[in-house]
A protein has these predicted regions:
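Bacterial N-terminal signal peptides that target proteins for export
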Residues: 1-9
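C-terminal motif of bacterial Sec signal peptides marking the signal peptidase cleavage site
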Residues: 15-19
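Bacterial lipoprotein signal-peptidase II cleavage site
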Residues: 21-28
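Post-signal peptide N-terminal segment of mature Sec-exported envelope proteins
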Residues: 28-49
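Secretory pathway targeting signatures of secreted, lumenal, and periplasmic proteins
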Residues: 48-103
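Second-shell loop/turn segments in exported
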Residues: 83-92, 143-145, 167-175
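Signature of long, low-cysteine stretches enriched in small and polar/charged residues
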Residues: 100-156
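Surface-exposed amphipathic alpha-helical segments
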Residues: 158-192
Length: 192
């Protein structure tokens, strides 16, 4: 009797294991990303023609030798992100060219983005004027900005991820860095 009962239990277990032909895939999950509280310090480079507050989480990188003067990268290794910043000395005639090129770079990202929101910025006391571009959707560069004094200086920045962008999973990082970029813009000043 025990042998029959043991045989039936073994047969039931065997049937349960091999009878299922439909597999249920597990949904993809993403790591929870919680950026730390933002703390800022003044950009620690006196040789640049501008100054702004930068997150203490960011590492300021100077580009390779031979890169134009005033270019820097703000790297966030713990978040896998860089903000590429470029500076151009301009004249009134080349300022329009720099602004158009900056808008063109934003437009190229619009092919992947659902929408572009532009926010104008003006600080007459520091002679800083510009625009912040927020790109919604699957864009490799969801936040870009440009700043100028409207006479001789032009500064541009673009946020890029070190991975294939997925707007939903990267939303906490994008929001955190958008706030960092807004702090950068609001604290920006020209040294000349």
């Amino acid at each position: 009797m025990k042998q029959i009962l043991s045989g039936m239990v073994f047969l039931c277990i065997l049937l349960c294991c091999v009878s299922c032909t439909e597999y249920t895939p597990k949904p993809r999950g993403y790591f929870r990303i919680e950026p730390p509280q933002a703390r800022y310090q003044v950009l620690p480079l006196d040789s640049l023609p501008y100054s702004f507050n930068v997150s203490q989480l960011a590492i300021v990188e100077l580009p390779e030798i031979g890169s134009p003067e005033g270019w820097i990268n703000l790297s966030y290794p713990s978040l896998g992100v860089k903000i590429y910043c470029s500076y151009l000395p301009v004249t009134r005639s080349t300022l329009q060219i720099a602004e158009n090129e900056s808008r063109s770079l934003v437009s190229r990202q619009a092919k992947q983005a659902k929408a572009i929101k532009e926010q104008a910025y003006s600080n007459p006391d520091e002679r800083v004027y510009g625009s912040l571009f927020l790109l919604d959707g699957e864009s490799a560069s969801p936040v870009q900005f440009m700043l100028t004094d409207s006479t001789s200086n032009f500064f541009r920045g673009a946020l890029y991820y070190d991975c294939v962008p997925n707007a939903d999973s990267l939303a906490p990082v994008t929001d955190y860095l958008r706030k960092d970029i807004i702090e950068l813009i609001q604290s920006f000043s020209w040294k000349k």
